[in-house]
């Protein structure tokens, strides 16, 4: 209801979500949807693990690996830079570690002002002055994100509801 009714947000935060999304196009969908929630005055803040973080440096042989953390063994994946797979003892997961340049390139299509910083193994973005998102681009993101599969194979099935809410938002906010 908040989306459809045009609720205006002063700030939006994306914390550690983007390093759990293994494919670039999927990360773009998330940023697109978050940008669609912004008004010209809204600030979007994002944080994700950077390639300077120990978890990624280990797969490049740049961080000490000893027997006590052998359960944290991970491997680099070659389909995109900064991606590794690990946590084999529980449930394997893919993690994306970002460079400052990659983070800038992820947000700059959606915002006119993008400031990127790196601190303590994280890359951070502060985004302002949202760009107008073509409806077709937003609809593509909504169709993907609101029909993701659950582990049992069923799907979210919220495409129509999401499209309706964002379409109404576009109509009332322009």
Question: At which residue positions do the language-model features occur?
Answer:
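Class I (Rossmann-like) S-adenosyl-L-methionine-dependent methyltransferase catalytic domain
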Residues: 1-4, 43-174
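Short coil/turn segments at beta-strand junctions that form active-site/ligand-binding loops
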Residues: 7-10, 42
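A short SAM/SAH-binding and catalytic strip from SAM-dependent methyltransferases
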Residues: 9-26
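Short His-Asn-centered micro-motif
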Residues: 14-16, 38, 47-48
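Flexible, active-site-proximal loop/turn residues at the rims of small-molecule/cofactor binding pockets
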Residues: 18, 30, 50
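A short glycine-rich, Lys/Arg-flanked "PGG" loop and its adjoining helix->strand segment in the class I
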Residues: 26-43
């Amino acid at each position: 209801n908040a989306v459809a009714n045009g609720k205006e947000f002063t700030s939006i935060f994306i914390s550690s979500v983007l390093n759990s999304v293994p494919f670039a196009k999927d990360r773009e969908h998330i940023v697109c949807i978050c940008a669609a929630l912004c008004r010209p005055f809204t600030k979007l803040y994002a944080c994700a693990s950077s390639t300077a973080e120990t978890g990624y440096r280990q797969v490049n042989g740049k961080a000490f690996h000893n027997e006590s953390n052998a359960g944290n063994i991970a491997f680099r994946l070659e389909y995109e830079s900064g991606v590794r797979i690990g946590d084999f003892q529980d449930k394997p997961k893919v993690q994306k570690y970002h460079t400052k340049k990659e983070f800038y390139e992820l947000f700059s299509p959606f915002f006119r002002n993008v400031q990127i910083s790196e601190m303590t193994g994280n890359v951070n973005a502060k985004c302002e002055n949202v760009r107008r998102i073509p409806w077709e681009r937003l609809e593509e993101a909504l169709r993907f994100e609101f029909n993701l599969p659950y582990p049992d194979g069923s799907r979210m099935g919220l495409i129509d509801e999401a499209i309706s809410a964002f379409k109404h938002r576009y109509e009332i906010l322009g």
